[in-house]
Amino acid sequence: TLFGVLPDTEVEAESTILGLCTGDADSIMPAIQKTYWDGIDLVAAAPILFNAEFLLPSRQANDPDFAFWRVLDSGLEEARNFYDIIIIDTPPSLSYITINALIAADGVLMPLPPNALDFASSAQFWSLFTGVCSSLFEARGETKQYSFVDILLSRVDKADLISNDIRNWIVSAYGPKVLPVEIPKTSIAASASAEFGTVYDMDVGSAQAKTLKRAHD
């Protein structure tokens, strides 16, 4: 929606990676569309992608040689020749789509709010992902390595003492993987997202200049 596309009404299956999941397409290129930002292209996502959670295991069951976790990686092969950076945004769940995204990625950036439940969920996620991928790769003699796995603290409220304690837990658990940059919790970001935008889409006159500058920085 931040790119001006409404997922529920304006996104067709052909504009997503669903064709890769069904086997009707072998490249992501036909799904790529331009945006109003020069140099930034988009492959849309929509609720229709939940069909992949049934399509991929069904294809795996019918074809033992099929590797469901390599669908997106293979589909991106051609696109890698045309883009300097490809960003894949996934839901915070260990779904078939998320597994595909993590296998296709060269690096991982996890936004993590300093919240007890989010911190616990992140630890459980990595434990589950490691277990799943180990079993998948060991069976086929494959390996997976990342150039980086970084944690980005988001929605940080430095006035919240409990959040500061949990932030220290996160730093203790993930060590140098926690980036020195933090995204502050601010009402400006909430106001911008309510208008289907970001803090960079707001003008200074629409909010307190000091608060907006802090969000920009």
Which residues are covered by each model-predicted region?
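P-loop NTP-binding core
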Residues: 1-217
